[in-house]
């Protein structure tokens, strides 16, 4: 849908800045580290030779040596989950589907757990109001917000230039 807010860069910043940025932020949370460099690629629409930035591949290197590979697809089959996160390491794998089902593959065990899920709006507002009322500390630092936002903006720039950029 070309008139959707995420596709109008002047309004929503595009798919990377408007949506894929949340994946960058989540990776920072998982690794407890800020991004140091990012590269991105996207397919080119053969009919108009324009980059399809709603189909994006992001590779991010973090300050602590971790690495994340994020793929954002807005044109996938609707049967698939909208959001899928896979974490692999030390012979174990964890797969999170739509933030509702977590599959644990540890050694020879294959277990899963289901969760109720929302969009996080209620929780975000609660955190914000607790901070405004001096009931809690701000869980976000300016350094984190700046690094995640800068990584998303650089990723969009990278798609257009084809070069890796330091964050």
Predicted ranges, named:
Residues 13-14, 113-115, 134-138:
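Active-site rim elements
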Residues 1-49, 162:
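Predominantly a Rossmann-like dinucleotide-binding segment in NAD(P)-dependent oxidoreductases
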Residues 18, 82, 140-143:
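Residue-level signal for the nucleotide or nucleotide-sugar donor/cofactor binding architecture
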Residues 7, 53-57:
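Short, surface-exposed amphipathic charged segments that create phosphate/polyanion-binding patches used
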Residues 47-53, 61-126:
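NAD(P)-dinucleotide binding in Rossmann-like oxidoreductases
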Residues 23-24, 121-126, 152-153:
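A general structural signal for well-ordered alpha-helical segments in protein cores
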Residues 34-39, 67-68, 93-95, 138-139:
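Acidic/polar loop patches that form or flank catalytic/metal-binding clefts of enzymes
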Residues 57, 63, 130-167:
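C-terminal helix-rich "cap/oligomerization" subdomain common to oxidoreductases
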């Amino acid at each position: 849908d070309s008139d959707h807010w995420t596709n109008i860069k002047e309004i929503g910043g595009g798919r990377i800045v408007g949506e894929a940025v949340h994946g960058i932020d989540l990776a920072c949370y998982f690794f407890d580290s800020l991004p140091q460099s990012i590269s991105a690629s996207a397919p080119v629409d053969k009919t108009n030779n324009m980059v399809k930035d709603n189909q994006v591949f992001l590779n991010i290197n973090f300050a602590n040596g971790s690495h994340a590979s994020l793929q954002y697809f807005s044109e996938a089959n609707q049967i698939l989950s909208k959001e899928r996160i896979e974490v692999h390491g030390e012979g174990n794998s964890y797969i999170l589907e739509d933030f509702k089902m977590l599959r644990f593959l540890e050694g020879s065990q294959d277990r899963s757990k289901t969760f109720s899920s929302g969009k996080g709006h209620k929780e975000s507002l609660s955190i914000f109001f607790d901070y405004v009322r001096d009931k809690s500390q701000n869980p976000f630092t300016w350094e984190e917000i700046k690094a995640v936002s800068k990584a998303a903006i650089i990723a969009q720039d990278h798609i257009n230039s084809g070069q890796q950029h330091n964050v």
